[in-house]
Regions:
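Active-site catalytic loop in hydrolytic enzyme cores
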Residues: 3, 80, 85-86, 90, ...
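A short acidic, glycine-rich active-site loop
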Residues: 67-86
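Catalytic metal-binding/acid-base residues of hydrolase active sites
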Residues: 16, 50, 104-105
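N-terminal phosphate-binding loop and adjacent alpha-helix
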Residues: 14-32
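Short, basic and Ser/Thr-rich N-terminal targeting/leader segments
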Residues: 6, 39, 93-99, 110-113
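Basic/polar N-terminal segments that are highly enriched at the extreme N-terminus
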Residues: 1-7
């Protein structure tokens, strides 16, 4: 006899980030988490690097042509743990959902990582996965 598979309701959410504005983007994510949970989602998934936005200039400019973009990304990147994980954790706990959120993570050494952040329904960071082999122009920004 086999056990019945559990059904999990997943919400794939793609709100527009407020580009290079971490706090405003997180506010949008929190609203989306609440909406997805109200619709029955148990797992809410967001895109790659949504906080504070994907650095798409890497595909349009010469490498290192304009350091101001990198500096702005660094200033708005996410510390783990930190205020962003606290805000997302509170939203996950309130909604009772799992989260998978793509962020630009900064570390004290000065490196930025394209990171997937997992947060459990208890509000705690359950896991962190860094994209360690960025491709093409992404290598001028991440890891």
């Amino acid at each position: 006899m086999t056990a019945a598979a559990a059904t999990v309701t997943v919400a794939a959410v793609q709100p527009t980030p407020v580009f290079l504005d971490r706090d405003a983007t997180v506010e949008r994510l929190v609203a989306s988490i609440d909406e997805a949970a109200a619709s029955g989602a148990q797992l809410v998934v967001f895109p790659e690097a949504i906080v504070p936005g994907y650095p798409d200039w890497v595909w349009r400019t010469r490498a290192w042509a304009d350091q101001s973009w990198y500096r702005r990304l660094w200033e708005q990147a996410v510390d783990i743990p930190g205020p962003v994980t606290d805000a997302l954790g509170s939203a996950a706990r309130r909604a009772g959902v799992w989260l998978a959120v793509g962020v630009n993570e900064r570390v004290p050494s000065g490196t930025l990582y394209n990171t997937l952040l997992y947060i459990g329904p208890d509000g705690a960071v359950a896991g962190v996965h860094r994209k360690l082999m960025p491709t093409g122009g992404e290598r001028t920004v991440w890891g």
